[in-house]
């Protein structure tokens, strides 16, 4: 048997934090140590507590959490940097006999920790040169070049989207490999099992409405007011923070600001379900099922026994990849 990393995924407000803690406690009852590794990009920022639904002090005391409150809001967290930190943390925990439980928001971040994904980086000089060529030669000429260098990537990309064509050519020049070689693969590089939390849309929308109200009650306006001078270009993109900045500037009233937060959170949740739904390795469970934790533990036991390995090994065959920007 191989002790798997447990990755808990699903839309915002679906209860991932609670399930992660419940699994860790259940494992502890069986004599196995487990700790949580955060995969939510914005929960890594110090002080961004209410707006990111960061685990409370009590929750973090119940089960040790990693990669929370590790950078200041002025700093930048990239998925490539997170990948390095997450894999180092997972390796350290496993070396001490502790099972990592990955709990996260962004699908790309959660996958970056455990999947076959590389991030080639960028070169401003190469990017600028390609952008100048697009202006002088046209998007069609660049796409023809991509088609000659990487037919697989070109076959799946929209020739009317020069930004992605430029990115693909940039990666080819930087790596000397086809752009398609850098695409995310549905292939674990760390033995893992993914558990997804699913809710009917009305139930999820209700949870989001309750969370948004709780953000107001907990002092989200005051949090943003305090953090505003320190929010960098990345941190300020966390959902809800710009709405409160606009509220403080008199652009929104309080009701409209929080209504917009709720609406955009619901939209994000639907996008997240689309993202996670493309991964055939995820074992979906009903978040409101009273036997949720029991069902999750059964999945973990099957994964540790290798029961899912034959299906997981073929996951890439069933998946159409979305050719987006893979950047540092």
UniProtKB/Swiss-Prot annotation:
InterPro entries noted in UniProt: Dimethylallyltransferase, IPT, P-loop_NTPase
Positions of ATP binding: 10-17
TM ranges: none
Site (Interaction with substrate tRNA) location in chain: 106, 127
Pfam families per the UniProt record, alphabetical: IPPT
Xref: NCBIfam families: miaA
Protein name stated in the entry: tRNA dimethylallyltransferase
């Amino acid at each position: 048997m191989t002790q798997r990393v447990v990755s808990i995924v699903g839309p915002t407000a679906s209860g991932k934090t609670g399930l992660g803690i419940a699994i860790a406690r259940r494992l502890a009852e069986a004599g196995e140590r487990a700790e949580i590794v955060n995969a939510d990009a914005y929960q890594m920022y110090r002080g961004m507590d209410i707006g990111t639904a960061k685990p409370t002090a009590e929750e973090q005391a119940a089960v040790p959490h990693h990669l929370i409150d590790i950078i200041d809001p002025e700093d930048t967290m990239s998925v490539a940097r997170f990948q390095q930190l997450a894999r180092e943390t997972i390796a350290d925990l496993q070396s001490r006999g502790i099972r990592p439980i990955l709990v996260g928001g962004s699908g790309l971040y959660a996958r970056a920790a455990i999947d076959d994904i590389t991030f080639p980086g960028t070169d401003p000089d190469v990017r600028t040169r390609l952008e100048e060529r697009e202006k002088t030669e046209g998007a069609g000429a660049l796409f023809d070049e991509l088609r000659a260098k990487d037919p697989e990537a070109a076959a799946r990309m929209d020739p009317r989207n020069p930004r992605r064509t430029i990115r693909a050519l940039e990666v080819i020049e930087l790596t000397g490999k086809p752009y398609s070689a850098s695409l995310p693969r549905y292939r674990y590089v760390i033995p893992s099992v993914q558990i997804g939390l699913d809710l009917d849309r009305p139930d999820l929308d209700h949870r989001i409405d309750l969370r948004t109200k709780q953000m107001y009650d907990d002092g989200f306006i005051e949090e943003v007011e305090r953090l505003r001078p320190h929010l960098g270009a990345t941190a300020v993109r966390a959902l809800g923070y710009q709405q409160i900045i606009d509220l403080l500037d008199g652009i929104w009233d309080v009701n409209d600001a929080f209504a917009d937060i709720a609406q955009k959170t619901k939209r994000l949740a639907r996008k997240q379900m689309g993202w996670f739904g493309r991964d055939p390795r995820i074992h979906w469970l009903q978040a409101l099922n009273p036997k949720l934790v029991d069902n999750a533990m059964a999945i973990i036991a099957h994964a540790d026994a290798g029961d899912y390995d034959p299906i997981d090994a073929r996951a890439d065959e069933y998946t159409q990849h979305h050719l987006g920007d893979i950047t540092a």
